[in-house]
Structure formats: structure tokens, C-alpha cells
């Protein structure tokens, strides 16, 4: 009964406030959907991050990857998951698109990576929501401009070797930092532009009076000096214009360009003044032409990145500037008409016509207020106040857009310059790395270590020999010298670098193993005390200058009784067969292995080169419990195993 009351209580409350009537009988249970199964809750594993959603959620957009059957290719049978090796952060936005139907762009994501993820899942970026679409388009445009700049710089660098003379000259004009000569010409033209502008200003300054005449300007008092300065500047500008015209890729487009027109207007008054006579009728026209010399200041735009950015900003804000001009024109006409009719009844009014009222309207809307024209009537003052407030609103609205565009273009140029500098430094490092291969680097490093060791142990003559001799050959001959000192045998060189043939010596096996060159230096500076341990460093006839640290390694000494295949596998670079007089066999007594260091050969590093190597000796036969050695192996015969023969192989590795 209590359960029934609890079930009806929400409906009773709803009926009390008028939501729904109270039913006469209990509500039936909700029908179970047989088609809805638990396995419709699928798991999407994106780079280790698991996302769960309903299959019907993904099937809302069957044209995409997750909504089609193509996602079955990514199904993992072991984990029963769909695994995608993609960015999990972007996938969160993708999954929200399937859930809500709205695609958003996260501002912290890279635009290229975001586009790649959308392309992988088969989602068009045009369906991005209105709240994020403008941000997406701005980032897309900036990325496209950056890639275009990078491609242009790469194309310019790739086409540099095949540039013609004209192309090289034009590239020097457009980018003066390509060569020293172009940079010098760039600064020379900039200096003469500054001199020309200063001359045009200073020649109008009064420079005293002449007796019997009025005060003269400097241009007339020192006419020769100013003429020489003007001539020098015009000559430089003329040469620059002709060179640019010659090197231009398209001369027609160059002549039509704004900077070309400025160059012509800047130098034309000088040549017109040369051919113009002193006739008073044309002197006024000549003075008017001299005014155009002030346009030479626009030539600074080639030398100032800020001026160029300002030009690009005004060009990119053409629509905003057009809106500003159109709004001002409408407001000027409206308020000029209103002010004319408002001040028409005043006797001392200066608003004589609507065009005359334009001046007052322009000055008022731009918040200048010269005060030469002021309204007299109350209606004129009221409309004048409205005109002033309207001007503030009309002018202030497009200004933030222009400022933001200027900031965007400026920072874009800064980033482009920084990328070019970084790329130039990276290419320089790559060129330096390509000049020397890894073998050359290792060769020089090894020579440095060996020369350092020779400076401590060798004589000047030997150091000179070590520097002039070949590294590998010197190491090889040093190794032969060490073997001769150790075994008392002579060697016949079969190959000057790799292989040597001599007679056999039993129970010796030299194994190749790479060691550092400083091992020899350490061994030459150290005296080994006598010891009772069977160390190789104290054994007479077995110690060499290139194997003094063999006892410090943990590598097990191979046994001469191992199979021949094991012995052959230990050979790496070369095999030395030793031939000579009959040598006494090694004693099998453990006490005979412990000799004093003075009895053996002392380490000898007084050679032209030092070679580091590892010589491993087979372990002597084990002793019997009675202290006697086991009998030696039988002499070779028809039934002798291969290991007894293979034990006479000496293997040497030359570093």
C-alpha cells in the first residue's frame, strides 16, 4: 500500500497545481523497448581516453566516419572497443557535435590540426556554429597568409641559383638585405631622400635682408648651393627610377603603380624648371610644380616597414573607410541643410548657403570647432550640439576596426620576420652539419684523444709521426709491435690493414672488442702490484699496452675446448695465424700464473699511435682435488676434434 501511495504522490501534486488530472486507476508500467539493447552503449577509445555514447547518437549523421559502417574497421575484438589513434581533445568537440548537433571550435587548438581531425571524421568545417565561425575564419586566414609567406620565401630561395641579371637586380631593390651592394644603395637613396626633404623645407626660411630689398629666403640668397643639392638628389632619384624600370618584371604594371607615379612627380619639377624660361606668365605654373617636390617624402615608404604596414592597413580597411566616408557625407549634407534653415532668420548669420554651411558641419563633426562660424539662434545651437555628438559617434565606430587590422598586420609581419630569421639560422646549422659527416667527426674525435695521450707519454718526434701517419695503419702496426713484444715472434703482414699471417701459439685467442683510447693512457700511468690472483695483467707474456684493463671487465673468458662454431662466432674483423719457433706450452699450475709486474713486460706507450683492444685468454685447465692438473689433451690425430685446431686462432679487432 505504501508503494502505491509513493507512486501516486507525484501525480497528486501535479494535479493540485493544475498540471494534469488525477487518474482513476494506477498508471501502467512503461513499455519496454525490445529493440533497445545494452550493447548499444559503445566505447570509443581515442589514444587511451575512453568515451562512451549510444550507437543511435552516432547514427544521426550517417555520412560521417562514426555514423557509418566504416568505423567497424577500427573495432578491437579483444577489448570490444573502437580504437582511434587521434587527438582526444579535438574528439571531445566531435562527440559533442554528435550529441547536440552543434560543432564548436576551441581557440586553444591549432587550426591545421583541427582541420585534419575534422577531415578524418568526415565532418565539414562549414557547419561550425555561429559563435565560433568568425574566430575559425580569422585563424584560417592568418594561417593561410603565413603559409603563403613561407611558400614565397621557399620559392625565392629555391629559384635563387637560376635568377637572371634583371631578376637579381629587382630582388635587390625589393629586398635590400640580399647583398651588400643592394644594402649600400638602399641607405644611399634613403640619405638623399632625407636631404631632399630637408632642403625643400630650409629654402623657405628667411636668411636676412639685402640692402635696398626686402627679407630674402635662404633658397634665393644661396640659390647656387640649393640648386646643387637639388641636382644631386634628382640625379640619384632618376638613376633609381631608371634601374627599377629596367629590372621590373612587368614594366607596364610598374609604370602604373603608385610608387612609380610618386617617383615621377618627385623629379618632374626639376626637369621642367630647367627648360622653363624666365617668362612671368609661366613662373606661377613653375611654383605650382615645385609644390610636388614634397611628395618625395612618400619615397620613405620603401625604407619604413611601419609606413608599408599603414598602407596595407588602409587597403585592407577599404570597406570600413568607405562606410566612414559615406556616413560623414550623409551627416554633413543633413546638418548643413538644417543649420542653413535654422540660421536663415538671423541678420548677422554667416550661413549664407548650404555649401557655406558645409564648413561649419565638417569642423563640428570632427570636434575641431574653429569658431569662425557659430550659430546665433536657439534652434541653431541645438542642432549644432546634435551635429557634434553625431560626429563623435560616426567617426569613432570604424576606428577600432582600423586599429585592429593595423595591429593584426603588424604582428603578422613581425612573426614573418621572426620565422625567416629562425629559418635562416636553421639552414645555416644544416649547412654546417652537412660539411662534415659522422665518420669525419668520429675520426677527429679519436685523433684528439690519441694526441692527448701522446702528449703525456710520447716524445715530440713520435707526436709528429702520429699526426702525419694514417690512423688505422698506425694502430695496426702498433698492435703488431705489441704482439711481437709479448710473444717474441715475428709477423708477416698479409694485409696492411686487416689480416696478418704467422704461426700458431696454443691456448691463445684474441677477441675483438671496442674500447676507449684512454685505457692505454691509464695503463701506462699505473704500476700493478704483485698479486696471487690469476689476473691477466700480471702474467708475463700476456700483458700488452692495449689490453691492460681486461681484468676489470666482467666478460667471461672463453674456453679453448668450446666447439668450433662458438670460436668462429667470436671472430669479428680479422684472424691472425702465428707461425714461429716452438714455444713452451703454458704451465697448468695456478701458482705459476701469478708473476710479479716487474717480471712481465712493462706497458709501452712510446709509439706513434695507441690502439685499444681486448685480448681474451682461454681459462687454464681446472685443478684436481689433489692439486694436480688434469692431463693435457692428446696430440692431433685423425680423430682429433676441431676445437683443438681452432684453439690456435688469434683474433684481433683494430679500432
Swiss-Prot record:
GO CC entries: dendritic spine; neuronal cell body; postsynaptic membrane; sarcolemma; voltage-gated potassium channel complex
Keyword annotations: Cell membrane, Cell projection, Ion channel, Ion transport, Membrane, Metal-binding, Phosphoprotein, Potassium, Potassium channel, Potassium transport, Transmembrane, Transmembrane helix, Transport, Voltage-gated channel, Zinc
Residue numbers spanned by region Interaction with KCNIP1 and KCNIP2: 6-21, 470-487
Localization in the cell: Cell membrane; Cell membrane, Sarcolemma; Cell projection, Dendrite
Reaction equations catalysed: K(+)(in) = K(+)(out)
KW Metal-binding (keyword) present: yes
Record-annotated membrane-spanning stretches: 183-204, 224-246, 254-277, 284-306, 319-343, 378-400
Protein name: A-type voltage-gated potassium channel KCND3
Amino acid at each position: 500500500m505504501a508503494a502505491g501511495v509513493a507512486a501516486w504522490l507525484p501525480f497528486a501534486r501535479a494535479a493540485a497545481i493544475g498540471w494534469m488530472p488525477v487518474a482513476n486507476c494506477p498508471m501502467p508500467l512503461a513499455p519496454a523497448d525490445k529493440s533497445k539493447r545494452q550493447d548499444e552503449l559503445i566505447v570509443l577509445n581515442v589514444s587511451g581516453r575512453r568515451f562512451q555514447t549510444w550507437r543511435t547518437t552516432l547514427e544521426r549523421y550517417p555520412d560521417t566516419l562514426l555514423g557509418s559502417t566504416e568505423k567497424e574497421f577500427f573495432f578491437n575484438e579483444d577489448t570490444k572497443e573502437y580504437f582511434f589513434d587521434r587527438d582526444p581533445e579535438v574528439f571531445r568537440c566531435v562527440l559533442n557535435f554528435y550529441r547536440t548537433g552543434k560543432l564548436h571550435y576551441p581557440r586553444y587548438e591549432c587550426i591545421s590540426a583541427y582541420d585534419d581531425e575534422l577531415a578524418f571524421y568526415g565532418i565539414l568545417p562549414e557547419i561550425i556554429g555561429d559563435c565560433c565561425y568568425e574566430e575559425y575564419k580569422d585563424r584560417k586566414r592568418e594561417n593561410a597568409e603565413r603559409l603563403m609567406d613561407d611558400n614565397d620565401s621557399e620559392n625565392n630561395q629555391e629559384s635563387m641559383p637560376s635568377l637572371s641579371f634583371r631578376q637579381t637586380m629587382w630582388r635587390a631593390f625589393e629586398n635590400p638585405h640580399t647583398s651588400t651592394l643592394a644594402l649600400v644603395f638602399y641607405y644611399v637613396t634613403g640619405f638623399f631622400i632625407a636631404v631632399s626633404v630637408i632642403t625643400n623645407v630650409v629654402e623657405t626660411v628667411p636668411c636676412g635682408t639685402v640692402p635696398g630689398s626686402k627679407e630674402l629666403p635662404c633658397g634665393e640668397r644661396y640659390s647656387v648651393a640649393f640648386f646643387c643639392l637639388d641636382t644631386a638628389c634628382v640625379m640619384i632619384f632618376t638613376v633609381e627610377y631608371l634601374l627599377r624600370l629596367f629590372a621590373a618584371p612587368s614594366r607596364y604594371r610598374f609604370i602604373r603603380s603608385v610608387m612609380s607615379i610618386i617617383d615621377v612627380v618627385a623629379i618632374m619639377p626639376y626637369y621642367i624648371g630647367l627648360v622653363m624660361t624666365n617668362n612671368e606668365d609661366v613662373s606661377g605654373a613653375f611654383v605650382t610644380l615645385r609644390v610636388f617636390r614634397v611628395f618625395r617624402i612618400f619615397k620613405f615608404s620603401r625604407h619604413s616597414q611601419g609606413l608599408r604596414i599603414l598602407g596595407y592597413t588602409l587597403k585592407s580597411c577599404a570597406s570600413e573607410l568607405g562606410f566612414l566616408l559615406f556616413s560623414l557625407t550623409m551627416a554633413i549634407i543633413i546638418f548643413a541643410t538644417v543649420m542653413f534653415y535654422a540660421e536663415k532668420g538671423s541678420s548677422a548669420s554667416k550661413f549664407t548657403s548650404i555649401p557655406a554651411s558645409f564648413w561649419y558641419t565638417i569642423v563640428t563633426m570632427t570636434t575641431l570647432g574653429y569658431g569662425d562660424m557659430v550659430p546665433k539662434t536657439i534652434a541653431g545651437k541645438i542642432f549644432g550640439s546634435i551635429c557634434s555628438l553625431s560626429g563623435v559617434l560616426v567617426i569613432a565606430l570604424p576606428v577600432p576596426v582600423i586599429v585592429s587590422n593595423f595591429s593584426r598586420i603588424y604582428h603578422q609581419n613581425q612573426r614573418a620576420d621572426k620565422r625567416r630569421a629562425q629559418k635562416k639560422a636553421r639552414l645555416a646549422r644544416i649547412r654546417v652539419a652537412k660539411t662534415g659527416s659522422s665518420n669525419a667527426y668520429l675520426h677527429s674525435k679519436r685523433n684528439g684523444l690519441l694526441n692527448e695521450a701522446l702528449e703525456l707519454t710520447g716524445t715530440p718526434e713520435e707526436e709528429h709521426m702520429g699526426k702525419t701517419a694514417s690512423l688505422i695503419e698506425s694502430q695496426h702496426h702498433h698492435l703488431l709491435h705489441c704482439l711481437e713484444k709479448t710473444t717474441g715472434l715475428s709477423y708477416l703482414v698479409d694485409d696492411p690493414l686487416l689480416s696478418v699471417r704467422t704461426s700458431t701459439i696454443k691456448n691463445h685467442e684474441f677477441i675483438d672488442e671496442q674500447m676507449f683510447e684512454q685505457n692505454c693512457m691509464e695503463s701506462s700511468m699505473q704500476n700493478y702490484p704483485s698479486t696471487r690472483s690469476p689476473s691477466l695483467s700480471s702474467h708475463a707474456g700476456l700483458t700488452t699496452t692495449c689490453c691492460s684493463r681486461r681484468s676489470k671487465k666482467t666478460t667471461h673468458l672463453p674456453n679453448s675446448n668450446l666447439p668450433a662454431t662458438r670460436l668462429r662466432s667470436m671472430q669479428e674483423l680479422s684472424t691472425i695465424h702465428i707461425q714461429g719457433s716452438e714455444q713452451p706450452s703454458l704451465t697448468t699450475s695456478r701458482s705459476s700464473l701469478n708473476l710479479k709486474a716487474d717480471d712481465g713486460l712493462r706497458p709501452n706507450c712510446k709509439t706513434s699511435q695507441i690502439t685499444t683492444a681486448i685480448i681474451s685468454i682461454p681459462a687454464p685447465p681446472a685443478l684436481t682435488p689433489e692439486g694436480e692438473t688434469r692431463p693435457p689433451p692428446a696430440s692431433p690425430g685423425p680423430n682429433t676434434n676441431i676445437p683443438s685446431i681452432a684453439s690456435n686462432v688469434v683474433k684481433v679487432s683494430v679500432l
